[in-house]
Amino acid sequence: MGRAPCCEKMGLKRGPWTAEEDRILVAHIERHGHSNWRALPRQAGLLRCGKSCRLRWINYLRPDIKRGNFTREEEDAIIHLHDLLGNRWSAIAARLPGRTDNEIKNVWHTHLKKRLEPKPSSGREAAAPKRKATKKAAAVAVAIDVPTTVPVSPEQSLSTTTTSAATTEEYSYSMASSADHNTTDSFTSEEEFQIDDSFWSETLAMTVDSTDSGMEMSGGDPLGAGGASPSSSNDDDMDDFWLKLFIQAGGMQNLPQI
C-alpha cells in the first residue's frame, strides 16, 4: 500500500502560515466545524493539506488554548497521566483543557523527565554495593573452581620420581633375595634328609657281617654258651639293631633346619 502524495507533489503550500490563511481557517471552522480534516482545505479554499490545517487549529488557533508556562498542578497531572497512559500525548491533552499534545510532549522531554530521573551521584552510590556483591560472588566462584592440588615444580617432580624408582628397585631386590634363600634352604633340607638306596645297601651288609661274626664266636653250638637257642639270640640282636636304626633315622628327620 503506497503512501499518499503530500503537499509538494499536489501543488500545496508548505512552511509558515500567513495571517490571511489563519483568518480563513478560523472563519470556516466557526461556520462549518471540522468534521472532516481531509476535505476541509478544499472546502475552505486553502492550498494546504488536511494535516497541516488540523495541527494549525489545535496548536495555535483554538479559542481555549492556554498561553504561557505550565503551572505546578499541570505538571503533576502530566506526570500522573504519563504513568497511566505512557506516551499517548493526545489522550493526555484531552484531560488537560487548553493544552495541546505538542506542548505537553515538549514540556515532558524538556523539564519533567529530567526531574524524575535519579541524580548521577545517587546512581553511583547505588551501583557501588551491587558491584561489590558481584565481585564477592565472582571471588567465591573462583575459590570453588580452583583445584585443591598444589602445583609441583620440575625439580620436586624429578626427585619424587627418582625416590619412588629407588624404593621399587630395593623392594624387588629384597623379594628376589628372599625367594633365592627359601629355594636354597629347601634344596639343602632335601639333600640332608634324603636317604638313597646306597644307605640301605650298606646297612644290610653290616647286618649280615655282624650275624656271621656272631655265629663264628658261638663255635657252632646250637644252644650257645648259656644253653640258649642261637636263632632266638640272633632274632633279639636283629630286633635291637632295627630298633636302633629306626630311632636314629627318626632323630635325623627331626633335626632343625639350618
UniProtKB/Swiss-Prot annotation:
One of its GO terms (cellular component) is nucleus. SMART domains: SANT. Induction: Induced by cold stress and flooding. Residues 211-234 are annotated as: Disordered. SUPFAM superfamilies: Homeodomain-like. The keyword Ribonucleoprotein does not apply. Transmembrane segments: none annotated. It is found in: Nucleus. It holds the Pfam family Myb_DNA-binding. Residues 9-61, 62-116 form the HTH myb-type domain. Keywords: DNA-binding, Nucleus, Repeat, Stress response, Transcription, Transcription regulation. GO terms for molecular function: DNA binding. Disruption phenotype: No visible phenotype under normal growth conditions, but mutant plants exhibit increased tolerance to cold stress. Acts as a negative regulator of cold tolerance. Negatively regulates beta-amylase genes at the transcriptional level in response to cold stress. Suppresses beta-amylase gene expression by interacting with TIFY11A/JAZ9. Maltose produced by beta-amylases has a role in protecting cell membranes under cold stress conditions in rice and may contribute to the cold tolerance as a compatible solute. Interacts with TIFY11A/JAZ9. This is Transcription factor MYB30. It comes from Oryza sativa subsp. japonica (Rice).
